[in-house]
Amino acid sequence: MERRIFGIETEYGVTCTFRGQRRLSPDEVARYLFRRVVSWGRSSNVFLRNGSRLYLDVGSHPEYATAECDDLSELVVHDKAGERILEGLLVDAEQRLAEEGVTGDIYLFKNNTDSAGNSYGCHENYLVGRHGEFSRLADVLIPFLVSRQIVVGAGKVLQTPRGAIYCISQRAEHIWEGVSSATTRSRPIINTRDEPHADAERYRRLHVIVGDSNMNETTTLLKVAVTDLVLRMIEAGVPIRDMTLENPIRAIREISHDMTGRRKVRLANGKEMSALEIQSEYHSRAAEFVDREGFGPVHRQMLELWGRVLKAVDTGDLSLIDREIDWATKYQLIERYRAKRDLPMSSPRIAQMDLAYHDISRTRGLYYLLERNNQVDRVAHEPRVFEAKNVPPQTTRARLRGEFIRRAQEKRRDFTVDWVHLKLNDQAQRTVLCKDPFKAVDERVDKLIASM
């Protein structure tokens, strides 16, 4: 597949601290957050002018799904734009609460677990051809995805019966199946529910739900770029060593608990390999593939970073990657603080730091403190992020959806949209079906807009 459509869906954690008598439940806090959305969209499930979807998911979790992107850097920009949109809702909600006499702070966390042990996800979407054998895709991808956490995990302080330990992945403890059609009940690595949001005869949507939510833009870019490379190798028929895991679910937890990347996990053929060895195998195949096929600068930069992360894990020298990779950045931050204050990993202050790293408020969040102090690298520069809050990607179907929404709102027309339909709710109930996610220009949509 020459071009590929990508998308990221992120569920956010919500909590609120109060200083007065009145208390609000998480459901009520979520309703305050979405009050402005509901006032213009008449729903807590809306599509925005930038082509994205914003909605309140199960369990009062705000969720933002980026518009369809065919460019990796643009995907990162749109993921960050979603963060900024939610930050704006947070500021509005706090002002509204203050006007009503409720004193408190609302927090939105771009992480994957709350203090009660609940998990919420960051789902990656990759458009793949229908003609390929999906089961083979999953077979090759699962060992890659299980071990990928040592490269792009978000890091977590995990309380265990033997004390607190620092883990590489937040999501690893909450994955229960390899491949499944459910997302909440069983939490698989790859979700197989067949919803391509495109021409079902031509495409499938690979829905990866094993990944962590990343604060660092470079980690997000790396996560999607290396997965895209592995997909392209599979699609091109590149021979990849059989590293099928005997028990992917046990392996994902064992790998997460070992920052050295050296702990061996058992393969289905009885052999054993470490996460470092598994990732190195994929990386060396990818390096040959990129050299042979010729890729653009983004894939080449991410291939270099992938190798550098593996070197950092191998040598234990996290200074090689602590500006770019979330789990390393957070670990170094926590370790410096612990050394200064002589604190154990189990200290409540460390748990608080772990959470504060993921606070999306730019005035309060620990990650944004590092960003202000130029201690982390960026790939999505702020003017582009600001523009992406309102402007859809211009080379995919998202452009049609965004333009339709913008014009309908300006003309005060009642409309309904989803990923594939654009509908004017007038007497004629005119609807355009947009099955091709690569198509950014469509005469039928132009006519529908002109008729408003």
UniProtKB/Swiss-Prot annotation:
One of its GO terms (molecular function) is magnesium ion binding. Mg(2+) binds at E9, Y55, E63. One of its GO terms (biological process) is proteasomal protein catabolic process. It catalyses: ATP + [prokaryotic ubiquitin-like protein]-L-glutamate + [protein]-L-lysine = ADP + phosphate + N(6)-([prokaryotic ubiquitin-like protein]-gamma-L-glutamyl)-[protein]-L-lysine. Keywords: ATP-binding, Ligase, Magnesium, Metal-binding, Nucleotide-binding, Ubl conjugation pathway. Pathway: Protein degradation; proteasomal Pup-dependent pathway; Protein modification; protein pupylation. It is an enzyme of class 6 (ligase). ATP binds at R53, T66, W419. The keyword Transmembrane does not apply. The keyword Metal-binding applies. The active site is at D57 (proton acceptor). Its EC number is 6.3.1.19. Catalyzes the covalent attachment of the prokaryotic ubiquitin-like protein modifier Pup to the proteasomal substrate proteins, thereby targeting them for proteasomal degradation. This tagging system is termed pupylation. The ligation reaction involves the side-chain carboxylate of the C-terminal glutamate of Pup and the side-chain amino group of a substrate lysine. Belongs to the Pup ligase/Pup deamidase family. Pup-conjugating enzyme subfamily. The reaction mechanism probably proceeds via the activation of Pup by phosphorylation of its C-terminal glutamate, which is then subject to nucleophilic attack by the substrate lysine, resulting in an isopeptide bond and the release of phosphate as a good leaving group. This is Pup--protein ligase. It comes from Geodermatophilus obscurus (strain ATCC 25078 / DSM 43160 / JCM 3152 / CCUG 61914 / KCC A-0152 / KCTC 9177 / NBRC 13315 / NRRL B-3577 / G-20).
